[in-house]
Amino acid sequence: MFDFELDRAVAWINDGGFSSVALQLPEGLKVRAAEVSDFLHSSTGAEIIVVGYPCYGACDLFDYKGVADALIHYGHSPIPSMGDDPNVMYVESRSDATVDPSVMDSLASLPQRVGLLATVQYLGLIPSVKGMLEKSGRTALVGKGDRRICHPGQVLGCNCTAAESISDEVDAFLFIGEGDFHPLAAAFGMQKPVLVLNPVTGEVRSMAETRDRILRRRFAAIQRASAANSFLVIQCSKAGQNRSAEADLMVRKLREHGKTAYKVILEEITPMSLMAYRVDAFVNTACPRIAMDDSARYDRPMLTIPEAEIVLGERTWDGYVFDQIRSDR
């Protein structure tokens, strides 16, 4: 179960004197939206407005102004580099799952030096897993990410700097969490094995096959885009995905290499939103996972920034890197 911290939310609404509050949840938690809304309204008297738009992370924070007095954002931690708004409350929805020591039998293949990673919901399990690994004679390290990362060991779909910070000191990474989205960021970004420990099922698996399958698709997209003459550079208007400087630089690079280049600004990047543009290929400067994970949905090559640089000859195929959204500020 995930902790919705309803008592803390009630106290925050009452202390702030908010008469209306927007409620933003990721897709996996929206099944609880009615229950949470009912509880908060009955406990505070505030009008609760559920945000129905898809929510992909704290990078996709809803602009509540003009709709409500405040916002409660569920399922993600703050992105420190985006600044602080006292009228926004983050509820990380931590899991109460535990890891049984018997899981160590499935981790026998781990090398001596291991880096630990997790999504925000399972960060609380890092100390216990670290203790189990150290008891087995291994060294377990937890890295610290850049200013997009709120907690040590945390991985976002667009940022694996917590892994990067300890990469030279470990031989493999163990990710604690569910699904492929977050561990793939580490698998793409690090040239080292990444294993996933699912704390709900106890399953342990490698990301190598999934990573390699997606990378083969990426190289195919790069090859297809090599024949393109016209490109649409996509800039996203979401606050946490808006890389305007990178988009402008990419337009200039394409034109310097004799390509026709245009820039479009979109809130939501979908096949439908790009269908009308008569270009040969797209360069995405928003969340890199749009290109990497969803490329099969688009009828033309969709590239990340480093992939476009390979097409232009500014980067070699051997120099392929994961397009992280970073922040050192």
Stretches with model-predicted labels:
Residues 1, 8-22, 227, 317-329:
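Iron-sulfur (Fe-S) cluster-binding modules
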Residues 3-7, 13-207, 212, 216-217:
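The feature marks the mature, well-folded catalytic cores of soluble enzymes
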Residues 25-36, 128, 239-247, 251, ...:
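Cofactor-cradling patches in redox/metallo enzymes
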Residues 52, 144, 265-268, 304-306:
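Short loop/edge segments at beta-strand edges and connector loops
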Residues 70-71, 75-85, 166-184, 225-240, ...:
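Extended, charge-rich low-complexity interaction segments
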Residues 94, 200-212, 288-329:
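Peripheral docking tails and interdomain loops at the edges
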Residues 102, 106, 121-128, 224-229, ...:
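Short, glycine-/small-residue-rich phosphate/pyrophosphate-handling segment
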Residues 181-260, 268-276:
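Redox- and metal-dependent alpha/beta enzyme cores, enriched for Fe-S-associated oxidoreductases
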